Each structure stands twice: as structure tokens, then as C-alpha cells.
Design a protein with these regions (language model features):
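Right-handed parallel beta-helix
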Residues: 126-226, 235
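Acidic Gly/Asp/Thr-rich repetitive segments characteristic of extracellular carbohydrate-active
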Residues: 45, 49-83, 88-89
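Extracellular beta-strand/beta-solenoid scaffold signature
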Residues: 111-118, 139-147, 162-168, 189-199, ...
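Secretory targeting signatures
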Residues: 1-52, 56, 70, 99, ...
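Functionally critical loop-and-helix segments that line ligand-binding/catalytic clefts
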Residues: 32-52, 284-288, 328-338, 343-459
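Extracellular beta-strand-rich solenoid/capping regions of secreted or surface-exposed proteins
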Residues: 72, 87-100, 108-129, 133-153, ...
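Solenoid scaffold repeats with emphasis on beta-solenoid/beta-helix
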Residues: 80, 90, 97, 107, ...
């Protein structure tokens, strides 16, 4: 810390001694409300009756008691209809084949806890409505419910349970996974599980309306590009979504709740993350969204609620963090490790323990635009009623830095002495201490739906 910082701290301590033990006022409505019980509407992954009969695979006018036998007899473009229970592992090596259950969950393929249950090695294969379960346990050989090694595969309305990896898509293009339920093994520790959907050197995949739980990471990207993930729900795992070395991908309208981290975006660029929800992700790391070594990406319109850190920004450069709701997180935004050149505007910071915290030795000027962010605790004055505060706001200035480093000082957070320092920092550059500066704070929150998280715990 520099000498100026010590001088400011000394002034605060002296002022506090004069005003006595003044504690901050409490908003009783905030104390009485909590988002802790919020949950999304998710399926019971095991609430399904097992087909009672032995399996029958129908190919045209022929019937087989083995899926593999039917696949071996099929030609390109054929459809095989499945009903009942099959205890086997299947390899689909004929292009254009469709395997579909007579009704959803009306056919089970049980792998007997050995290896991958269904392996697709041909192009243009469709697998629909089938319950796939009991893969092997060996992550070193990628034991999976479904292993896709053929382009343009479509996996639709599957139930994939008690598996190491749910769906592994490796080095192929154009895969679709939609309306599918994936659940791993509850008796396997989280760190030892596979991922729900694992994308390896994959391009142009579409992942839509899937429900994923009890895995390590819900959707894992590794050198994957051009992937669209929309409408998926991930809960009870390490990371809901995890990017590594994966550029030019889009996440939209996904929900991640009750995980360690909702969305972990790492070592990637040109990502678009829009209109997603991250709630109550408060495990060891505890981030709604983690941006680590991410560049030139858009984080827009997301709702980050009840996490340890709503948004944790680590060595991230040149990103747009715009129009997000940050509600009731321990820290709204935590920025560190040289993150800079971010446009941060149009966000609503409401009822967070700390709105923002910056580990920096310099001043971060957010929003070089016509609007800033809404800070619920800012007491913004807008004399000309243009919606923009008349003075800048320091959400992470001298006082916030002191309280973060010396928690015992929180008792004086709303004292006249602390308010005087905030006013000086906001009104004119007398105290240009390190931290965050919002040059054009908003008078009203852009998000008028934030109370919905209290009114209805089922999203």
C-alpha cells in the first residue's frame, strides 16, 4: 500500500473515534428475504418405470432380440424400432441409420458396467427416445453412455444414467444433442466422475434443452468451436459449463444452479454468453460466472444470483460485461490479476454483500459509454432526471478495500467518516486511490424483475 492509502486509513480511524460506534442501518426486508431456496424446474432423473419385457428390435418386417444384430442387418437410411430391455453394448457403423424407441424410455440398453454402451462410428446416425445406462467406470478410456465418432449425429430425447461420461463427442462436426437427460453416479465422488457432455475438437455442435446432473462438469469444451448451447439446465456438479481453449462459441438461455461454479470460461476468446441464469453456486470456488484468461467476449443479459462471487474476472481483457443482474451475491464482481479494458455498463448491483472488489494497484474506469451501472447502495443523485447520476461512483474504492482487508471495519461502513471518504472520491479526484470508478452511475435499475427470485422459488 502507498503512503496516501495509509493516510486515508488513518483519517478514517480518527474520524470513527470521534463519531463513536455507529453501525450501518439494516434493511429489514432484505434480512427477511433470501434466494437460498430458489431452484429451477428440473426432471427427476430416475423417476421412470423400466420396460418389463425382453428387448425386440424391429427392422422392417424382421425382429431381432439384439440391437447389434439389427444394426448389422441394416442398410444406409434404415430405421430400427426398439422396445423392451437389451443387455448389451452396441456399435453403429452403418451411415444414416436411425435407432428409435417405440415410445420415450420404452427401450433400455444396459451396458452392464463395462465400457461404452453405444458407440457411433458412422456419419448421419440418429438415436432417439432410448434409455442408455450402466457404462463402465474407466475415465482413462472414456467409458460413456454414448460415444460419438461420426459426423452429423443426432441424439434426441435420450435418458443417460449411471455412466462415467454421458455423451462424448470426439473430433467430429455437426453433432446435435437435444431434449436429453444425463445423470452420473451418486456413489462416485465428484472429482472422479466424467462430464455430462464432453466436446473434444468438435465444431458446429448444437446442444439444446438438455438436463444434466451428478457429473463432474455439465458441458465440457476442449478445443471446440462454433458450438451453440441453448436452454440447458445443470445442477449438483462442479462446473455447469466449462470452456478450455475453445473459441467462437455461444451460450444462451442456460441455467446453472447449486454447483461449485455455474459457468467457467477459461483460456478462450470470442465467446458470446447471453441471457443465462446462475443461482446459488457457492462451493469451494463459488462463482456464478468465472472469466479466466478470456478475451474479446460478450457477457450480456445474464442473471447472477446468490453466488459467492457473481462474476469473478481473472486476467480477462477486452470483454463486454453488459446488462447483467447481480443480486444477493457475497461479492457482485471480483476483478483481479490484471483484468482490464472491459466495458462494464447497464448492470444492476442489488443486495450484494459487496457490490464490487478489485485487487489492483491502479484505477479501473468502467464504461467509457453514455451509461454506467446501477448500484443499489450508491444513493445516486439525479437532479436533471436524465437517468444518470450527477457524480461518479466508487463501488470499490478506499473504504471497500479497507473493509475487505479488515472485516472488523464493516461495523463503520455507513458511518459519517466513511461516507465523507466516499463523497470525496465520488465528487472530485482528491483521493485517486486504486479501485473501480463508475463515471456515469444509473439512477434506476435496468432490471425490474429482480424481485421474482424472492416471490417464486421455482424458476
Amino acid at each position: 500500500m502507498n503512503e496516501r492509502y495509509f493516510a486515508v486509513v488513518a483519517a478514517i480511524v480518527l474520524a470513527c473515534s470521534l463519531v463513536g460506534a455507529v453501525v450501518s442501518a439494516t434493511d429489514e426486508s432484505q434480512q427477511d428475504e433470501s434466494v437460498a431456496d430458489w431452484s429451477a424446474d428440473v426432471p427427476d432423473v430416475h423417476d421412470v418405470a423400466e420396460p418389463p419385457d425382453d428387448g425386440v428390435a424391429t427392422l422392417g418386417d424382421r425382429e431381432f432380440d439384439s440391437v447389434q444384430a439389427a444394426v448389422d442387418a441394416a442398410g444406409p437410411g434404415d430405421t430400427i424400432v426398439l422396445e423392451g430391455r437389451f443387455d448389451e453394448r452396441v456399435t453403429v457403423d452403418t451411415p444414416g441409420v436411425t435407432l428409435e424407441a417405440l415410445e420415450r424410455d420404452g427401450a433400455v440398453i444396459d451396458g452392464g458396467e463395462g465400457g461404452t454402451v453405444v458407440e457411433i462410428v458412422a456419419d448421419d446416425v440418429t438415436l432417439e427416445g432410448v434409455w442408455i445406462r450402466n457404462s463402465g467406470y474407466d475415465k482413462n478410456v472414456d467409458d460413456s453412455g454414448v460415444f460419438v465418432n461420426g459426423s452429423n449425429a443426432t441424439l434426441s430425447a435420450l435418458r443417460v444414467t449411471d455412466v462415467a461420461f454421458g455423451v462424448w463427442i470426439g473430433s467430429v462436426d455437426g453433432a446435435t444433442v437435444e431434449d436429453t437427460i444425463i445423470a452420473g453416479r451418486e456413489d462416485v465422488p465428484t472429482a472422479q466422475r466424467g462430464n455430462g457432455i464432453h466436446l473434444w475438437e468438435t465444431t458446429d455442435a448444437e446442444l439444446t434443452n438438455n438436463s444434466i446432473t451428478i457429473v463432474r462438469d455439465g458441458i465440457y469444451y476442449q478445443w471446440a468451436e462454433g458450438v451453440v448451447a441453448e436452454g440447458n439446465t445443470m445442477w449438483n456438479m462442479r462446473y455447469g459449463v466449462h470452456y478450455m481453449y475453445s473459441n467462437d462459441n455461444r451460450l444462451e438461455n442456460n441455467v446453472a444452479f447449486d454447483n461449485d461454479v455455474g459457468f467457467a470460461l477459461m483460456v478462450s476468446s470470442e465467446l458470446t454468453m447471453r441471457d443465462n441464469v446462475a443461482v446459488n453456486n457457492d462451493g469451494t470456488s463459488g462463482h456464478g460466472i468465472l472469466l479466466k484468461d478470456v478475451e474479446d467476449s460478450e457477457i450480456v443479459g445474464n442473471e447472477l444470483v446468490g453466488n459467492d462471487n457473481g462474476l469473478f474476472v481473472y486476467n480477462a481483457l477486452g470483454n463486454r460485461l453488459v446488462d447483467n443482474l447481480l443480486l444477493e451475491n457475497d461479492v457482485g464482481v471480483h476483478t483481479t490479476a490484471g483484468s482490464s479494458n472491459e466495458l462494464v455498463a447497464g448492470n444492476s448491483f442489488i443486495r450484494n454483500g459487496e457490490a464490487a472488489f478489485a485487487e489492483t494497484n491502479s484505477q479501473l474506469n468502467w464504461n467509457g459509454s453514455e451509461r454506467g451501472n446501477y448500484w443499489a447502495e450508491a444513493r445516486t443523485v439525479d437532479v436533471d432526471s436524465d437517468g444518470i447520476g450527477d457524480t461518479r461512483y466508487r463501488p470499490a474504492g478506499t473504504v471497500e478495500r479497507l473493509v475487505h482487508e479488515r472485516p472488523q471495519a464493516a461495523a463503520f461502513a455507513e458511518s459519517p467518516a466513511f461516507d465523507a471518504v466516499r463523497m470525496a472520491e465520488s465528487s472530485f479526484p482528491v483521493l485517486e486511490s486504486p479501485g473501480i470508478v463508475d463515471q456515469r452511475p444509473l439512477a434506476d435499475p435496468p432490471h425490474d424483475n429482480w424481485r421474482d427470485y424472492y416471490a417464486d422459488h421455482d424458476h
